A protein has these predicted regions:
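TPR/TPR-like (Sel1-like) alpha-helical repeat modules
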Residues: 103-126
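Flexible helix-coil transition and linker loops at the boundaries of alpha-helical arrays
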Residues: 2-6, 43-52, 83-88, 125
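Structural motif corresponding to the intra-repeat A-B loop/turn of tetratricopeptide repeats
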Residues: 26-29, 69, 105
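Structural signature of alpha-solenoid helical repeat junctions
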Residues: 12, 31, 50-54, 74, ...
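TPR repeat positional signature
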Residues: 12, 16-19, 59, 95
Length: 149
């Protein structure tokens, strides 16, 4: 794909991401269905254009959509797809998402591993919006760092 086509694909994907976010803010079944379709369409474009960062974002958005409806197996699958994309292995947010889904699927050893990777990559701040559940769980599985939590 040429540079111009890549830029066009990126612009279309950015519009799709914005549309999906807007649909999700409706917090209705219709909004969820619309967001799902929009994300899948954008993901197809990102895959065709071989845009790894956009693929990671879209797989995570898809996983977040499933996670929000407690479809943890399907969310886990989307996050697993994300982590296998070039560059994602270094992304603590993807590890955090995998850790959360593994926690809810009761794969606790794997949850601890993924949450530890998230913690090492982003620090305690990555747990700021989860009510403490995942960080408290992680603290039961790791020794405290030398300077404390």
């Amino acid at each position: 794909m040429s540079g111009g086509q890549n830029l066009q694909a990126k612009a279309e994907i950015a519009r799709a991401i914005k549309a999906a976010i807007n649909a999700l803010t409706l917090e209705t079944k219709e909004g969820m269905i619309e967001a799902h379709g929009t994300i899948l369409g954008a993901l197809e474009q990102a895959e065709q254009a071989q845009l790894a960062p956009e693929q990671i974002i879209l797989f995570c958005m898809l996983g977040d959509l499933y996670f929000s409806t407690k479809k943890f197996e399907t969310a886990h699958s989307a996050y697993t797809d994300a982590i296998h994309i070039e560059g994602a292995i270094r992304n603590p947010k993807v590890h955090y998402r995998l850790g959360k889904t593994n926690y809810h699927l009761e794969n606790l050893d794997r949850a601890a591993d993924e949450l530890a990777r998230a913690y090492m990559g982003a620090g305690k701040d990555i747990f700021a919006n989860d009510g403490g559940i995942y960080f408290e769980f992680l603290k039961t599985r790791l020794k405290p760092p030398p300077k404390g939590w």
